[in-house]
Structure formats: C-alpha cells, structure tokens
Amino acid sequence: MHIFINHGFRDYLKDNKKAFDTPINIMEMGLGSGLNALLTAESIDQQVVDYIGIEAHPITEKATYLSLINSLPHALDNQLIESFWDTPWNTPTKITPIFSLEKRHGKIENLELTPSSIDIIYYDAFAPECQPHLWQEDIMRTVLSWLKPGGYLLTYCAKGSFRRTCKSLGCRLESLPGPPGKREISRFVKQSKES
C-alpha cells in the first residue's frame, strides 16, 4: 500500500480519534493521476474525508488518464476511477457518501486555504532538484500554516535542507521506512504553539 495511506491517513486516524462524521481534511500537492485520492477513497471505511488536490498541469486526455490508472499494480474500483475523471475542476464534489473531492487547477503559490484547516498534507511534488521553488522556505511556511496542530505533512523528500526548514517552521520530523528503492520518507508533525 502507498506511504501516504499507511503513514499518513491510517496513522493519523490511530493518533487522532475523531467522530466518523467529523471530516478529515486532506490536501495533496501534485494531484497528477489522482492515485493518492483514489487510494484514500478506497481506504476509508466510515470516516468522512474532504480531499483537495492541486495540480498545475492536469491530464487532459481521458485515454491517457485511463492508461496510467490501468497500468498500476493495484486494481482500483472502476466506478471510483470514472467518478474521479468526471469530477469538475475547482468544485467540491461528493464522490461517495463519505468522500468529497475538490480538484483544484492551479499552482500552490496561488492556493488560498484557511490557516489550520488541514489535517494531512500529501506533498507529492517533484524532487527539489526538479522544482526547487516548491521546497523553499516561503512556500513551506504557507503550506504548513494550513496544517492543524498535530497534523501531518508527508513527502518522499528526505533532503537535509528541506527537513531543517520544516523543523525551523515548527514541525517535528519523523523518519519512516520508504518504499522499495527509497531508504526513508519524511513525516512532519506540526507542533502546537505550546510545544
């Protein structure tokens, strides 16, 4: 299973007991094919989830989208796949009775969210070498401002300078085992002001 699901969504539910009808708010940077959103939707049993995914360069051809999704080793529910594709951009849409999705077309530097409104951030941007601006302190200050105290930010990035930036912005680093080919991943937990 995917690191965002196991070390993000599932661990967050274990560590933060919420009523099932109280939404878990998830924001994904780098929505791409929607794999993380689809896996999250498949993973929930009773917990309500409101999911925002931001993508600067969305897939525009349905055939390309289906080819990407169908090439995955994990078979996904066809109705869920169709619902994801059919969801209009920039409009919150109920995909299942307990999973709402808002696909936002745009760049993270233009995204406006309420401070301390997000429980989990899946930071699935390309590596700092490919998109350095997405890993700079000013962007991370904004992104982390959206995270609730105790909230998680997960990323494949284990670069020292990025880790130091997030720690300096009030997050505790948890290094976790990575998937095959990746030694470790980073989970940051936003500390409360009192910590």
Annotate each PLM feature.
Residues 65-114:
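S-adenosyl-L-methionine
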Residues 159-195:
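Class I S-adenosyl-L-methionine
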Residues 7-17, 21-82:
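SAM cofactor-binding core of SAM-dependent methyltransferases
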Residues 56, 135, 158:
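Short beta->alpha hinge that forms the Motif I/post-I loop of the SAM-binding pocket
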Residues 150-157:
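Conserved beta-strand signature within the Rossmann-like core of class I S-adenosyl-L-methionine
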Residues 119-133:
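A short SAM/SAH-binding and catalytic strip from SAM-dependent methyltransferases
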Residues 134-149:
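A short glycine-rich, Lys/Arg-flanked "PGG" loop and its adjoining helix->strand segment in the class I
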